[in-house]
Regions:
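Amphipathic alpha-helical "lid/sensor" segments that cap RecA-like P-loop NTPase cores
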Residues: 2-5, 200, 210-213, 234-280
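Conserved adenine-nucleotide phosphate-binding loops and their immediately adjacent elements
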Residues: 3-44, 120-121
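Winged-helix-like regulatory helical subdomains adjacent to P-loop NTPase cores
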Residues: 8-10, 27-36, 59, 269-288
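Walker A/P-loop nucleotide-binding motif
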Residues: 50-68
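Post-nucleotide-binding-loop coupling segment downstream of the phosphate-binding loop, primarily
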Residues: 66-155, 161-167
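A short beta-strand-to-loop transition that corresponds to the Sensor-1 phosphate-sensing loop
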Residues: 86, 159-160, 192, 196-201, ...
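Conserved Walker B catalytic segment
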Residues: 146-149, 153-196
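The catalytic "switch" region of P-loop NTPases
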Residues: 181-233
Length: 288
């Protein structure tokens, strides 16, 4: 008998993989990530024993990309699970909610199971305390991680956590985001780390305990803008100065401008003139 994905799902009594993985990540992998000082700082904090970190910054400053860079820099044998609260922008759509505790903790638990070969969390029941079940999985996940290498870490990251809270608060009646349960998880095994990311202006909505260390992700420095641009073309120094100024060093604004210019990257400045653009202005233009 051929063992297929469908036959396994049938044995588990499910017909749709979304029963096991209801909130798969929609995050796109970034190629050719260049090192930023903040990535190095995160690695230093994780290695020094900081178990709870919140990365915060303005929209488009590169928080999601920083997580990808951090994953590449983790000690040998480490594992990183990233929960995507943004969902490609669909986190407010009724058929794509990501804020509900049952969905989020099933996804997180089964991501751990998939990566570390642990038992799957299958049940959906009003009688299950999903945050508690998730926390009970951490010791075994920690042990498997430790068996891979002495310094190996297990990182569980919640990206764009503030969007999850926003989605929960937008419901009628108001609902609870899983983020508040996640940040309140109790004692962690020594090699487990929790990371959440958020826009700085929304930090208060996360209700972070004082055990979380805050680390701001700033926009690009001028030197970082130069490195970013070099992946597209060999721009003169004066052009880089103007591009950095008009984009305000925001990585996502720069990406939109460079994508707009397509095969003529020098035209990226025209996209930002005369006074520069922020993310909100770019989004408004896309809807017009």
């Amino acid at each position: 008998e051929i063992i297929s994905r469908q036959s396994i799902m049938a044995q588990l009594g499910i017909s749709d993989a979304r029963a096991l993985f209801p909130c798969e990540s929609a995050i796109k992998k970034v190629d050719n990530i260049f090192p930023r000082d903040v990535s190095i700082k995160v690695i230093q904090m994780l290695s020094a024993g900081n178990q709870r970190i919140c990365l915060h910054g303005s929209g488009g400053c590169g928080k999601t990309t920083i997580l990808q860079d951090v994953e590449k820099k983790l000690p040998k044998g480490s594992t990183m699970v990233v929960y995507d609260c943004y969902g490609g922008g669909r986190y407010l759509d009724s058929d794509a909610f990501r804020h509900k505790p049952v969905d989020a903790f099933i996804q997180l638990s089964n991501d751990l199971a998939r990566l570390l070969r642990l038992p799957l969390l299958l049940s959906r029941s009003m009688n299950i305390n999903y945050p508690k079940v998730f926390q009970k999985k951490l010791p075994s996940a920690s042990s498997i991680t430790a068996s891979k290498a002495e310094d190996a870490l297990l990182i569980i990251a919640i990206d764009a956590a503030d969007n999850s809270v926003l989605a929960a608060q937008s419901q009628t009646p108001v609902e609870r985001s899983f983020v508040h349960d996640f940040v309140s998880v109790g004692t962690l095994p020594s090699n487990v780390r929790l990371i959440v990311t958020s826009r700085s202006g929304n930090l208060s909505s996360l209700n972070l305990p004082p055990t979380f260390s805050l680390l701001e992700v700033e926009n690009f420095k001028r030197t970082e803008t130069a490195i970013h641009v070099s992946g597209n073309w060999d721009a003169p120094s004066t052009w880089i100065d103007d591009f950095h100024h008009l984009s305000r060093g925001n990585p996502r604004v720069q990406r939109y401008a460079l994508d707009y210019s397509e095969e003529n990257p020098a035209q990226a400045l025209e996209y930002l003139r005369p006074n520069g653009k922020g993310l909100s202005q770019i989004f408004l233009e896309q809807f017009e």
